[in-house]
């Protein structure tokens, strides 16, 4: 049987342990609320607005302007891309704080600069266009001047060739048309030669059909010179007609040639026989007696 003293000792130890545990547990609960109170009482971090509210007025105003400028820049960057392309770029040093008013001034300054540059570019482009137009005008004037000089040179050469040809023809006519009197030849001047040549042409037109040998004798010419003269007049267009194989020249006027051409055009296809049969009506071969007398008397 256990002694009472031992039981009392065990009970005392058990009670002491219980009291220790109870005190320990209560102390932990009181410390936790105290810690919570300390944490709740500790100052929390302030926001930008709270810091700005507690800052001096000047610093607070500068910060507000900077924030407004940032918001404006952010809104501009989020705007339409087309408006961004037309907005001039503003060079702001890195780290530099710019307010809204300052930013507006910088934008206006940049816009004026861009406008000046655009106007300057427009002036340069206009100068280039005017320069090109002036060069083109000068080139056209130079080409026109060269063309006029070329035409003038061609006209001058044509006149010289015509004068030389007329002089040569005059020499040939002067050699062909001579008047033999008392064993010597009288050389005609230019006017007399031209008059005699006109009489020569008028006589052929009046007679219509002339024997070249008789024509040469009538105008005191060699037959070969007379034939050559008729051919030259035909080439010059002063006589129209044909020379047959018997040495006759048949004069055909321009009106008669047009009548023959009209006849052929109306008939479409014309045989030689039809043309010969109709030639008496289209071409008049009867001499003009009055004209012949007038030429011979001149």
Swiss-Prot record:
Q: Motif UFM1-interacting motif (UFIM) at which residues?
A: 176-190
Q: Which residues lie on this side of the membrane: Cytoplasmic?
A: 26-298
Alphabetical UniProt keywords: Endoplasmic reticulum, Membrane, Transmembrane, Transmembrane helix, Ubl conjugation pathway
Subcellular location field: Endoplasmic reticulum membrane
Recorded hits in InterPro entries, A to Z, give: DDRGK_dom-contain, DDRGK_domain-containing, WH-like_DNA-bd_sf, WH_DNA-bd_sf
Segments on the Lumenal face: 1-4
Q: Which Gene Ontology BP terms does the record give?
A: protein K69-linked ufmylation
Q: Which residues cross the membrane?
A: 5-25
Query: Basic and acidic residues compositional bias: what residue ranges?
Result: 105-140, 147-166
Q: Molecular function terms in GO for this entry?
A: ubiquitin-like protein ligase binding
**Per its UniProt record, what SUPFAM superfamilies does this chain match?**
Winged helix' DNA-binding domain
The ranges of region (Disordered) come to 28-166
Protein's membrane topology = Single-pass membrane protein
Q: An example Gene Ontology cellular component term from the record?
A: endoplasmic reticulum membrane
The keyword Endoplasmic reticulum appears for this protein: yes
The record's subunit annotation is: Component of the UFM1 ribosome E3 ligase (UREL) complex, composed of ufl1, ddrgk1 and cdk5rap3.
Q: What does this protein do?
A: Component of the UFM1 ribosome E3 ligase (UREL) complex, a multiprotein complex that catalyzes ufmylation of endoplasmic reticulum-docked proteins. The UREL complex plays a key role in ribosome recycling by mediating mono-ufmylation of the RPL26/uL24 subunit of the 60S ribosome following ribosome dissociation: ufmylation weakens the junction between post-termination 60S subunits and SEC61 translocons, promoting release and recycling of the large ribosomal subunit from the endoplasmic reticulum membrane.
What is recorded about the protein's domains?
The UFM1-interacting motif (UFIM) specifically recognizes and binds ufmylated RPL26/uL24, resulting in stable association between the 60S ribosome and the UREL complex.
By what name is this protein known?
Answer: DDRGK domain-containing protein 1
- Organism, by scientific name, is Branchiostoma floridae (Florida lancelet)
Q: What is the lineage of its organism?
A: Eukaryota, Metazoa, Chordata, Cephalochordata, Leptocardii
């Amino acid at each position: 049987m256990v002694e009472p003293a031992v039981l009392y000792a065990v009970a005392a130890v058990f009670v002491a342990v219980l009291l220790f545990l109870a005190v320990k547990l209560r102390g932990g609960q009181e410390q936790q609320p105290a810690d919570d109170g300390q944490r709740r009482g500790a100052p929390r971090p302030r926001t930008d607005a709270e810091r700005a509210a507690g800052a001096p007025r000047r610093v607070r105003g500068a910060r507000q302007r900077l924030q407004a400028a940032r918001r404006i820049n952010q809104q501009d960057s989020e705007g339409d891309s087309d408006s961004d392309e037309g907005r001039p770029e503003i060079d702001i040093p890195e780290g530099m704080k710019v307010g809204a008013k300052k930013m507006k001034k910088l934008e206006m300054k940049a816009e004026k600069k861009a406008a000046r540059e655009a106007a300057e570019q427009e002036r340069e482009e206009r100068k280039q266009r005017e320069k090109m137009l002036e060069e083109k005008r000068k080139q056209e004037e130079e080409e026109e001047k060269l063309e006029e000089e070329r035409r003038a040179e061609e006209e001058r050469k044509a006149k010289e060739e015509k004068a030389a040809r007329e002089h040569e023809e005059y020499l040939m006519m002067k050699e062909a048309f001579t008047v033999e009197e008392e064993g010597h030849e009288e050389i005609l001047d230019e006017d007399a030669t031209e008059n005699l040549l006109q009489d020569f042409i008028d006589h052929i037109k009046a007679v219509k059909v002339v024997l070249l040998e008789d024509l040469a004798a009538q105008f005191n010419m060699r037959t070969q010179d007379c034939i050559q003269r008729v051919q030259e007049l035909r080439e010059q267009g002063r006589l129209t007609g044909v020379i047959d194989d018997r040495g006759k020249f048949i004069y055909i006027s321009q009106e008669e040639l047009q009548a023959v051409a009209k006849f052929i055009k109306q008939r479409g296809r014309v045989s030689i026989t039809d043309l010969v049969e109709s030639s008496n009506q289209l071409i008049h071969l009867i001499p003009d007696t009055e004209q012949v007398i007038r030429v011979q008397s001149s």
